[in-house]
Swiss-Prot record:
Residues 45-71, 88-156, 829-863 are annotated as: Disordered. Residues 1-117 form a transit peptide. This is Mitochondrial 3' processome subunit 1. As part of the mitochondrial 3' processome (MPsome), involved in the maturation of guided RNA (gRNA) precursors. GO terms for cellular component: mitochondrion; protein-containing complex. It comes from the Eukaryota. The gene is MPSS1.
Amino acid sequence: MRRLILSQTLRVAGRHRPPVAMFLQRFYRGHGISTALPLHYSKRHRKREGRMYGKPLRPVSDGENGASGDGGVLTRWEAVVSSRHQCESPVQTLAKSEKPKKAENTVAGKMTGSSRFSHRRDHSAYPSGVQPAPLATSGLPTQSSERQQQKQIGQQQVPLDALHRLFKVHAVMRTNYEALGKCTKVLKSFSTACAEALLQLGVLQKEQPSAMERKGFIDVQLCKSRVTEASKNGTSSPCFVLPPESPLYRTTIKFPTITVEHVLTTTVPAGCGAKDSGGDIMSVDMEGAAPFPMGHCESRPSTSAGNGVTVEYDCEGDVLSHGAAWNSIIEGFGQLALNLKQNASVSDFAQLAETLAYFKWVKDEEQVGWGTEDCVVKKFREAMANAKDTSASGSDPNTSDVSAALAAIAESFLRKIPRVDCIGSAVVHRGGERTAPSVHAIDVMLNLALRMCLSQWHAMSHFERMNIVLFCTYPWFAEDLSIAAGLCLTQSYLQSLLRADADVTYQHTFHYVRRVSRLCWPCIHDTDSAPVKKLLFPRDPQGTAVSSHALEAVSVEEKDNQLNQKEGLQGEEQATTTSESKLMWLPSFKDASCVSYGSSMKQRAAYELLLLWMTCVNPSGLHRSSPHGRYVSATGIAIIDVDLFVTQRFRTGKSKDEWLLLHPVEGDVVASVTIRTMVQHCETPYALTRLFFCNFHSVLPHIWGGIGARRREIIWTAWCRAVAQPLVNTLSGSDEGQREDDGGMQTLQITVDNADRTLDYLKPLISALTSDELFLRLIMRCADKSLEEMACEIGSGNNTLPLSKWCAQLAGFVYSVAFALHCRAKREGCNRDGGPSRPNTATDSANKKVVSGKQTDNLPKGTQEDISDLQLQFKAAVSALLRKLSAGDTQVAEQLLHHFYEPHFSGDQEREVVEDIQRHLQQVCDSQSRDALHAWIECSARASCEATVPLKEELLCKWQRTVLEADAGLPVVLPTIVECCRGLVGLVKKRGRNISGRRQGQQRGTESTTVGEESSCKEVFSKEELPVVITVLSRAMLTRTSTVSTVGLTKISSEISTLLSSCGYETADGNTSGGGRNGRELCDTNTATITSATAGERTVELELILSGEIDQKAGELPWITILEAVQLQLVPYTVVKNLLTSFKGGCDNGKERLRWQELQRDFQRKRHHRLVGNTLVFRWYGCAVPNDEGWEDGSGLMRPMAEDRDNVHSASHQGRTSTELGAFTRRLLKTLARAEVTRLDDRKEITTQTFVVGPSDDSATRHPTPGQEEDANLQRLDLLFRVHTLAAHILMTASTKKPHMIHELYDTLLHLVERVMPTTPNAPGNASDLLLLWLVGSAVAVGLRFRPNFLIKWPSTPEVSSGNLKSCPSAEEKTVHILRDIEPYLQSELLRPTVRLRFVINVLVALRSLELLGARIDVEGLHMDQLLVRASADRRLLSRHVNLFLIGCSALQSTQSSILHTALHLREAKYNLSFAEIERAFVAIALSADTFARQHEALMEQNYQQQQNRTLSVTVAANNTTPALRVSPVQLRHAWSALGRRVLENAGESPTDLFVRGLQCAAAVGCIDSALYQQLLSYVVEFRWEDLHILDWVMILRTVRQSFENRRNLEAYLKEPLQAFMLTMTDSGDNSTEQSVQKVNLKNHEGEQLLEGLCLFAEALPGLFIGDRELWGLLWQALGSQWSACFNAASNIEEQQRITAWLQEINASYAWAARAAGFRGLDEPTAL
């Protein structure tokens, strides 16, 4: 019913409104605002909202760390007011309010109705029916008149209409002030409204200036100038005055004086007193208990002395709850106070105080003249500039003087700020005019509002108290109220937490902590904080604060006391700057005032108040609401921030006399014990942070995922700083405090003695966390993630932290895990045994489990997985850290070793806890990391003990140190090739040599000679500097080598040109992201030398200078330097013969031997030197690898360099040089092999790979840095070349060394191959084909034979090899094991879509060799023939590598048919083929023809069997005397014909073997009866018969007998030459000399090969000749003569015995041949 009547009333009221009002009504209604609500409805609504005031509408944003002091929370009431007036102008706002009839004639009513305040119109209007307070007209008022006045006021009711109107409009006026660009008219209107409200209350009075003389009255200001001003008509306006002896200024505002004792005795939670155990914290149940034991207090009276106020209280009550303590603030108000309390709520005064505080800052800024030329900022900066000038002049400024000057300036600045509770003194202006003291209307109203709020302290809500306390921290009062206000707020908040019906949320906690931390605002002496820097130092043109050197000199703290800006205390309530000048960086007036008002005493008080609150708080009181992530995290960050700031601010420790609030209380045992416990707990730094984790540990796991990453990082860093780092220092046995660099500031560590080192500071935390499994898992998860991020960040190279900081962080992470595991183990022990007990070592040893190679306790599955993950991350972090250490960082490595593996605790207490933590520490720290640390320390010691020659040049000294560290095995960053060239070019120019780089092509030869002449007369590098320069260049070039095929083939100038071309391409595209390592390396150096167009020519000149220096000093340089120069192609390889020539003669043999021994030691100890030697051997001594020029079998020096081939030498000179170079190369190979065999055990070898102890799948390995990739590549190349060296040495010495020595070398080779396989990438260029070739070639040389059933079948699933080589008993099984390991790499490369011809050929050759060793090969599934066909499709590739292709076609039976696709190419390119390639083509064609013939025969036999024609199947195969019909493809016959003509055309130059291969190939393709065959045969018989040996005749006899048409003619033609050959054999055998044997054996065969040839010759003769007894007798004589010659040429009895055994074979062959010819009487000759 009431709602209906109200709605009707609203409709009627709407119809009678004027058009303007109707428009406003529609406007507001369209914006969701009701304008027709009656006044009483608004008042009820406001009262209801006041009761709900305790709950703010919006949460604190994630980035909000605190707001400015004028209201940090938007309440529901403010939201309603602001929403109703957000679209209104000031005029509309004032016109909108209705004009109640009862207030129509009042001043406020006139102001509202006319949209103007009353002082602009009728100044004589006073409230009707209300008589203003009487004014004193003469003299000072007497006591009787005052009492009469108070009596009169008490008898009448003071109206509050103006005050209520002010309550309604103050928030809107503040909004309008900001919306209108800080309009001064709004400020003046607000001041007038305040004055009128005070006038209505009787606090102020009005008078005419022309009235009687005022005595004792104080003028009240409304704006910057006084109110009295002339109006337009010349009349004077009345002014507001404050009567003398006003109760507002009779006493200053003070808080009731309480002590910490009061707080402790009135906030003890029920049931949390000391137990029967005497208050042992370890036995206290932390759920619902305080961190420290506190006893129960009995009721007793006490007196708090302070400011003359005596208050009685007991333990059940609170001094703050008594009205007497607070009523003293409004003493003398009388009936006015009662009237205000009854008719105005405390919420209205609190909200009004917020607006008053806001406008007070505004008017004070104008009154002080902030931003003018005489601003106090100028004085501050002048003082700092004077200190800076003093420091720059060389003399240190007096710190105390500078500090005193800053304090004096700050004090004078604070005196200019008007106080709220007292009247300022008279002010003397510049002109000598003395102005009477005055007070501003805003100050008076703020005084009244604060007194009314404080007098009703117990009635205010939580957030209202926060705001009032905030105002009390500003410099607005006669006395500093900050500490007293904070203490009162702490006690009130603790009591609200302890009440059973209290509705306290985490939001309340956050606002309390933020308000208390407001006391910790930086003072003027904290010159390293952001607000103080902004105040003291100007801004540079770039907009950043000038870094003054005087900053360190003038600070009253220590030089390293820097505020951690990452955790944001200095910016918690930082306001934005209000104005900015071009010449100065002007801070806000509010910031400057707070900085000037700050003090170290307040900072200590903030710390102690938070410590008191965290100590007394009941954790269960924080759990009455759901945890809010933002508020909880913001609370923790604020506590952590204060703890960090105060701990670093007062680093000298807090003795008993230095505590501000926490003093032991005499007579109160309970409070004294509690305070003493807190003080002892704070002896270890960061106690406040530990208390935060004690109270909030159960909340953090639930909010952790919902807060920002930055907040998580701050909280986790605080845990490591407050818990982990003190634990590290305690267990490590540090004798004195350690300081670590914490984000640019020094933090104080534990400073207790060894004898007093205990873990008491961790007891509360251990007790709290024992039952919280979620928080322990959170700690372990954070540690695991931190370790992973550390490994990535260290490996990325982008970190800027010092190594000591990384070491401290790593220790903190690991010790956090050990601490969490200790708490978890303690909880499990309590659950099993009902209480903590010492672990039983006997039982534990029986319940051990292996976790990642470590013996750990019988842990749950989840714990084992956590420890395994942590072990992997710890390995990766240690590896990354070791890679960053240099030789001078030995202390860091020793510190890591000391922290993790050698902890020492010298205290006698808590031995059980310490041992348990150390045991869990060893579960995370594995033995591999310990071995790596020890190895690194040994390498560092080796590097420091290395003898070096002192150099004068700084750059060369740096390179020398880097080289020494690299040779010692330390992971260092070597200079790149670009950096080396840049440094050397600059050094050469510095020493007077001009490198212009502007030569023309036609002048290069002349200038090269000039450079050589200059280098011969002027020395650029000394003999001590040249080895350093050459080795740095050599290392840089090897670093850029990626595959085996590119080692040693590129000059320095060519590499620089490659870099230039790649950089130019990237620069043209404008994109450097895809340039790879080359582009990044060039762009990182940022050198003009390389980026210029003449960089390549400058590098060529540099090469010429270095070549000349090496030529001059070759005899004085170490041999390894000469080898490095050869590797760099600075000098030719022939220079090594000079080294041998200089030592010719008996007197120098000892010196030469010493040189070789020194070189061998270098190969043993230094990887780079070994790599250089192996590179040269690989390039100059090919081993068992087919190439384009022929088959290299490693029998001598094979490959001269390109420049050597261009030189023209005589034949004798070439032979002599080749012999000398071959001798040096073989000696070098022998030295390398000996160094490899005599080296230490591989496990003791120190290389940079030893330090990579992390897992193979960790983040650092998945994303390796360029330095790690280069080092891993060099390590792999070193292993590959070592395998090649051993294989070459085995092949070279297989016939000369003893068998057991060869087997030892082969066993070493197998172990090296096993080591290199894990480093082989599954990518092109992995050199697995070379490994297979070298392995198989060594096996052939050793004489290895496989078991008959050994099968190699590809493709196949790789078998998992069991064990290692040590488990294989024989060399055969070890070889099979290695072959199984190589197979996956070979198959994956063969299955790639792109065919690599050289790789395929190497694999085919190796497989053919395995067939010779007895293995069965089945590679049909890989279609090797198709790979060769695909390769032959590229004609250019086929032309370059035709020899390799022919070798591949000849390797296996399955690939022999591939020659058909190249037959046409052989015909077309016959004139471009060399004789060796023609010979290889004849062999390939013959093998292919034989394969087709066998396939044809098998097909014919299969057809005959299918037709069941058994009789014909017998005649398919030809007998010894009947030639078989050869069926071969026509392509092969045409290819043979073309190549045969090519041989005949160059018959004079063609070797004899080439003719023999042509005849053999003709027989294979079925062209025996051709004219070309007869021409070839006749040329050989007629002109080359002296060069034919016995095996050549065997081949001729076998081919001729296959002729069908010309067999008889050929038989007749060959009879005479054959008899002549047998006569020659007989004559040479009769001489019985070695020369005759060698004459017959033109191919230099051994004796056994010659005897085998005799048997074959005898068996081949009856295939063509039947002959007579004369022929067979001649044959018998020839055989006997040759056998006798071989027997007589034998050098020992063993050879004679082997030759004697061949006699039976020769007899058997001769008897079989005679029987086959039909001469049975000759089958058993008696001549022998």
